[in-house]
Amino acid sequence: MKVIKTLSIINFFIFVTFNIKNESKYSNTFINNAYNMSIRRSMANEGSNTNSVGANAPNADTIASGSQRSTNSASTSTTNNGESQTTTPTAADTIASGSQRSTNSASTSTTNNGESQTTTPTAADTPTTTESNSPSPPITTTESSKFWQCTNKTDGKGEESEKQNELNESTEEGPKAPQEPQTAENENPAAPENKGTGQHGHMHGSRNNHPQNTSDSQKECTDGNKENCGAATSLLNNSSNIASINKFVVLISATLVLSFAIFI
């Protein structure tokens, strides 16, 4: 009988320890699952809240500001005297940001006597004009002379004014010299205040840099994510309920073992 009682007691302790280990493992797995689920849902909500903005490539709009025009025409004229004249003008008009135009024309005249005349304009004959949006009037010789006279006058006045300014500065710098150490002395007492404020800001920043021991479930509840908070708490409640059930089973089994050991 004593052997049976001792064995039953040993079995009871083994059973209790085994159930406690299983309960701890089971509760830990449930807690870990709840924690992982809360993290996943928070990440999913953050991903849905962020708006994905696609980077639009800039459209390269190339606009040709110049237009090229080329005209070729040939004209032949014959008179009653048997004279024939052939003219072949070639005009190339190129218009760019500053529109330039160049015209080249060649004319050939042939008579019955076998004489041929060919006229080709030179570079001096081809006019080149430059057009701009802001036309500037030409400056004549009289206007240029007036301009130079005005500049000479202003230069003389500028030199005189510079000399006067130098004299005024030299006179003003004399009495201001002894005032510099006073300003330096006035600036020195302000230095420790800046140091104090810098230290205060550093201490304040170091306080804020300490990590706060708050769990993710509490953050989610405070942030207003009620769904995640409810899911995490529900899973934790389920794990606590399962743990209480396991404890109840352990107590029942313990009472049965003790009653069997006592009454046998």
UniProtKB/Swiss-Prot annotation:
Q: Does the keyword Signal apply?
A: yes
Q: Name one GO biological process term.
A: cell adhesion
Q: Which InterPro entries match?
A: MSA2
The domain of life for this entry's organism is: Eukaryota
Identify the stretches annotated as sequence repeats: 60-91, 92-123
Q: Which Pfam families match?
A: MSA_2 (PF00985)
Record membrane topology: Lipid-anchor; GPI-anchor
Tell me where it resides.
Cell membrane
Q: Which GO terms describe its cellular component?
A: plasma membrane; side of membrane
Q: Where is the lipid attached (GPI-anchor amidated asparagine)?
A: 238
Q: Which residues form the propeptide?
A: 239-264
Q: What is known of its domains?
A: The N-terminal region appears to be involved in lipid binding.
Role summary? May play a role in the merozoite attachment to the erythrocyte.
Q: Tell me what else is known.
A: Same sequence in Indian isolates FIS1 and FIJ4.
The protein, known as? Merozoite surface protein 2
Which organism is this protein's natural source?
A: Plasmodium falciparum (isolate fid3 / India)
